């Protein structure tokens, strides 16, 4: 198994640098037939989604579709596929950022009763408590 860094995954997905994209494809080619041979860890997923949204201006629906494609590709493995899949489902059905969905899902999986936040979109997620600051 090998791990992909964010910039390698971005090159693979966007092909905005043909030489780098080709280099990534060449490195991954021997692993195409090997199930779960390329790790996409949670940090890489979050950084990738942030970059695609902010820098490349991907729409939310395109990001959701991309996450679903990554999950269905047999070559890729994840820190916890079930947690990532649940986070993708939350992302698809809410206004929260993927990172917030992943935080909430992972915290619940790790036994947290709830996750507290000041983020309104995240606060609407299951097992998330929206805090309100009281004025002095």
Regions found by a protein language model. Give the residues of each.
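Amphipathic alpha-helical segments within well-ordered protein domains
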Residues: 10, 49-53, 88
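Short, conserved alpha-helical segments within structured domains
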Residues: 41-44, 83
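Acidic, PIN/NYN-like endoribonuclease modules and their adjacent C-terminal/linker elements
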Residues: 104-136
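Active-site-proximal, substrate-binding regions of enzyme catalytic domains
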Residues: 53-56, 60-71
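A generic structural signal for short hydrophobic patches within well-formed alpha-helices
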Residues: 9, 45, 122-123
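Short, well-structured N-terminal submotif of metal-dependent ribonuclease cores
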Residues: 1-40, 55-61, 132-136
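Active-site neighborhoods of divalent-metal-dependent phosphate/nucleic-acid chemistry enzymes
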Residues: 75-115
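Acidic active-site catalytic centers that drive phospho-/nucleotidyl reactions
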Residues: 5, 47, 100, 119
